[in-house]
Amino acid sequence: MHASGARFPNILLLTGISLLAVALIGSAQAAPSGHVIYEGSFQPKDLNWQTDAQGLVLPTFPGTRSLAQPGLPSVPVRELLLLVPTGMDVTSVQVEALATHAEKSLQTVPLALPHVSDDGTQISTATMKNSGGVFPAQWGEYTGSHFWRGYQLVSVSVYPLRELQEGGVTSLEFLDGFAVRAQMQPRSGSADVAQRERLVPGEPADNAAVLERLVANPEQVSGYMRQNGVAVEVDKGDFQPSAAPSLMGSGVSYLIITSNSLATEFQRLADFKTSQGIPTVVVTKEDITANFRNGADIQETIRLYIRDAYQLWGVSYVLLGGDSDVLPPRYVENSYYPSIGSTWIPTDLYFACLDGNWNRNGNSQFGEPAVGADLGDACDFAEEVFVGRAAVSTLTQAGVFVDKVIAYESTAAGAGWPDRVLFAAEVLFPSDFHPGDSISLDGAQFADQQVNDLIIPCTDMQYMRMYETDQLYPWDAPLTLAALVDTLDNGRYGIVNQIGHGYYYNMSVGNANFMTGDADALVNGDHTFLIFALNCASGAFDNSCLLERFVQNPNGGAICALGSVRAAFPYNSNNYQQEFFSLLYCQNEFRVGRTMALSRLPFIGSTANNYVDRWTFENYTLLGDPTLAVWTSSPDALTLGAPAGLGLGNNVVPVSVSNLGSPVPGALVCLQMPGEDYEFGVTNASGQVSFNFLPGRAGDAVLTVTGENLAQATLTIPVTPATPYLTLTSMGITDNGSLGSSGNGNGVIEAGETVALTPSLEETGGGALSSLSGT
């Protein structure tokens, strides 16, 4: 697809969020209006007709997915995200056809089948209609305006083919070229967008890199007017955050929210992460509710705190340190499933998406979708922070969680198990499959897609395909309960992808169910795995569900788990699963919470309406540490270069990081001496980083290096005094008339006063001083 875009004028930044309006784009006959923000084209040579898992022969183009509206033609759709100025309201969007032609293919577009959850429930409702003999009626659809970390994104669906019916004859029309036009006006008044007030070093460039691969008009990223925050000057010293989110003190990258009863264990995790160069703070819900502004309930109070932490501290990652009985989730009602009735979904997405308040209409229900002209609660599902949950209720469980994270990230160089992927895929439909039956959907299809499209081209990882049958796809071993338990117990796999049926307490593995008791009994030790479960409800953390039992296991099990809290719709869920693993294997996104959040962004345009993508967004959750660095190969051994020792006072500390003689760029390096100084940074292309380090007493500084597929390396650097060294410990202020002073005697320096300063000094170098003089 060819694309070009026009430059936007610089617009002053206004905080705000456009309403998530979902409006049908003007008809093709309407006179085009608005500013062209994007032009694109489709090439006839890129049209392919492929048979999908349901046996439908569908038209496809690169970068599209089928419009899965039951009972309507399954035309392809390309979902565009376009960057537009953040200070503007988007009032309308049109897709203008620039060139079309009659498609000569004799193929007809089949009708989409009902959506089917993995429990067999069918959803036949559609949000679009086929009327007037042309489908879709327009070449495109405006699906909403969203904010991600202060960047405004417009989502547009474009259809490269339309079906025409006239006189009983069906034909296809091909969209050769098109323009996206938007009418925008300066936003009046403020709107509710979370904005960075503290500058996070490196984040603007990092955000730009994400957007350049996400949006269809990446040329707009450079020079985009977005509030990055101010650089906060912090006094030299150890990590010293303020007591509550503010622009004072050290910045914070990782926020752990828990309860008073669990805080001591999570502080161990905070100390470990801080030593890696991820400055981390533990805050309890009791402290938040007692000392911070309260919302309508505890969930809103916690979200308000997270929003302040994002804006003022610079927080990017949040761990909800407690199960649903400790930190209650936000429940949202979704009427997409079942077709008659609705489902209450516990979603931690509420704590990650910080724009708006998820209750625009001010009633008792949060997270209501747009229905017709009613915009509902105008929820923006773009995640500003990357959230995970530690589903623990006791101090012992919290200790297990922390121990497992530390052990996983301390895996020795050369370990083989992180370099292997295990697939456990069964036939999804028919759900009562027996060997020899006709198969309408085999989970092995999704596994093979991942192997062929991602693992083989992007990694050197080994993989094991355990399938219920080899009727359609070759297996490496048959999937049975006994075989899966034995394989997991052996601890040979770092990533496990289960594709099949499931419920709160089980996942189906061909001939039997893998139950919570099986997860409890695993003994794979420190060889813990990431499990991504494409099944119904095994991630329902408001119950003692299967996925949380994997993570709670003290003798092995999983290091983290990703899955659905309620029903899952396999075809739709697979889009998100494939995108997650594409980011992990092919695009160097190795921190699990960030990877999960970014895997959802391409599909955000389909979330305003109460339909299958909104359902999937709300349902999938991460049970685990969101900062976890996921292994996708054997960890590399590191060689560190640093001074053999440091003196008291200011030191320039050059650090080099290499592997087998080659420099390692992008490694996170932290130098810390408790109570004295704390510095961290990332190595450049030459594998180097340098710190100004200011210890005030003798002792040891510790250098810690981590990164993508890098075995954690540490180096202790002694700090020894070369000469006596004085440290200022306090400064007395006298303004009461003594010592030549004049003032009001309150001990504060004020205008018009003459003050006497009395320093208190401590010799911290270990030497002897016979005299002291100063000027």
Feature-to-residue mapping (PLM):
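N-terminal secretory signal peptides that target proteins for export/translocation
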Residues: 1-9
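Bacterial N-terminal signal peptides
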Residues: 14-23
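Cysteine-dependent hydrolase recognition
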Residues: 29-716
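Short structured motifs
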Residues: 140-141, 640-641, 741-745, 758
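Proline/serine/threonine-rich low-complexity linkers at boundaries of modular beta-sandwich domains
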Residues: 629-637, 720-735
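Short, solvent-exposed loop/linker segments at the N-terminal edge
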Residues: 644-650, 737-740, 744-753
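Short acidic, flexible loop segments centered on an aromatic residue
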Residues: 668-675, 762-775
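Short beta-strand elements of extracellular/lumenal beta-sandwich folds
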Residues: 752-766
